[in-house]
């Protein structure tokens, strides 16, 4: 049984997309669609989470993810508490579980957790009270499920269906928790061909076992693609130099207008952010007509609203 689901199939935690059935992913995306108009209203709120307390526990820096979770929770009328790690008892050596236990004693209903250690969100989920839900907002290299979901939502909005697409994920797959979540979601939702493109040093050993095709050449990898997802170099997770220089990387694996022309004419370009312009993507592409990078950010609010609403409301998946 999947620990993220209750015995009757309801979402209890969101820790990873690996192992979640297609019906669950589709239901989250459908629920997100129903929240898309909230941001366009004069009063950008719905009362679904009124009286609920949501704690953002970000042990790693974040701009888009933390902010969109906060906006999403407030649009659901929840009370949001952002824990400032720099001034918290964590800096005094308090164990993460003690931090969580103390916050639980303050009648928390949900924890949004980002941590540098893979498995941190799973660890917390195993120790919280039954009424508390945990959302993994990124744990080490392991997973970033809400980013994976908002990327699927973006693809569905621009491409309609998944069953006839070729999707390429380009760059530092080895250190990317986003890539792992994207691959699990794409294969679960029925994308027939998922490609990863990058230098051998930045692709995990045995990545083919996840059901992807591997390319070390941009021209071959981008040919005929409907969706191109660029990843940044995760310099903060690298142990020692793996590349000669950022300029060298851009030469071979940076997405330029010339390289994008190898994909289908109506291909869309995505990036989970933050972008390193001139390293993995040229500004002409990032700001160009095929880029859907800013819509990704907008859609992230609706997707995170959907996740929190399903967790707190217990809507069947």
UniProtKB/Swiss-Prot annotation:
GO terms for cellular component: cytosol. Belongs to the aspartate/ornithine carbamoyltransferase superfamily. ATCase family. It catalyses: carbamoyl phosphate + L-aspartate = N-carbamoyl-L-aspartate + phosphate + H(+). Heterododecamer (2C3:3R2) of six catalytic PyrB chains organized as two trimers (C3), and six regulatory PyrI chains organized as three dimers (R2). It is an enzyme of class 2 (transferase). The gene is pyrB. One of its GO terms (biological process) is 'de novo' pyrimidine nucleobase biosynthetic process. L-aspartate binds at residues 92, 177, 232. InterPro entries: Asp/Orn_carbamoyltranf_P-bd, Asp/Orn_carbamoylTrfase, Asp/Orn_carbamoylTrfase_sf, Asp_carbamoyltransf, Asp_carbamoyltransf_Asp/Orn-bd. Catalyzes the condensation of carbamoyl phosphate and aspartate to form carbamoyl aspartate and inorganic phosphate, the committed step in the de novo pyrimidine nucleotide biosynthesis pathway. This is Aspartate carbamoyltransferase catalytic subunit. NCBIfam families: asp_carb_tr, PRK00856.1. The lineage of its organism: Bacteria, Pseudomonadati, Pseudomonadota, Betaproteobacteria, Nitrosomonadales. GO terms for molecular function: amino acid binding; aspartate carbamoyltransferase activity. Pathway: Pyrimidine metabolism; UMP biosynthesis via de novo pathway; (S)-dihydroorotate from bicarbonate: step 2/3. It comes from the Bacteria. Carbamoyl phosphate binds at residues 64-65, 114, 144, 147, 273-274.
């Amino acid at each position: 049984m999947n620990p993220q689901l209750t015995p009757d199939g309801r979402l209890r935690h969101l820790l990873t997309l690996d192992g979640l059935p297609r019906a669950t992913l589709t239901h989250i995306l459908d629920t997100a669609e129903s929240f898309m108009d909230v941001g366009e209203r004069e009063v950008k709120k719905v009362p679904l989470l009124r009286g609920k307390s949501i704690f953002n526990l970000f042990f790693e820096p974040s701009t888009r993810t933390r902010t969109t979770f906060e906006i999403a929770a407030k649009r659901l009328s929840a009370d949001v508490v952002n824990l400032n790690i720099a001034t918290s008892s964590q800096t005094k050596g308090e164990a993460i579980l003690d931090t969580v236990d103390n916050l639980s004693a303050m009648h928390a209903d949900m924890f949004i957790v980002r941590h540098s250690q893979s498995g941190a969100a799973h660890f917390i989920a195993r120790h919280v009270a039954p009424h508390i839900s945990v959302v993994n907002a990124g744990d080490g290299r392991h997973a970033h499920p809400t980013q994976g979901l908002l990327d699927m939502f973006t693809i569905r909005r621009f491409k309609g269906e998944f069953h006839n697409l070729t999707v390429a994920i380009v760059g530092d797959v080895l250190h990317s928790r986003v890539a792992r979540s994207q691959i699990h979601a794409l294969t679960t939702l029925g994308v027939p061909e998922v490609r990863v493109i990058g230098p051998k040093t930045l692709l995990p050993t045995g990545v083919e076992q996840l059901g992807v095709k591997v390319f070390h050449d941009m021209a071959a990898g981008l040919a005929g693609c409907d969706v191109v997802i660029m990843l940044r170099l995760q310099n903060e997770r690298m142990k020692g130099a793996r590349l000669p220089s950022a300029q060298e990387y851009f030469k071979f694996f940076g997405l330029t207008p010339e390289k994008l022309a190898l994909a289908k004419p109506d291909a869309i370009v995505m990036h989970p952010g933050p972008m390193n312009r001139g390293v993995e993507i040229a500004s002409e592409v990032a700001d160009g007509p095929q880029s859907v990078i800013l819509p990704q950010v907008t859609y992230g609010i609706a997707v995170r609203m959907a996740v929190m609403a399903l967790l707190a409301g217990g809507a069947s998946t």
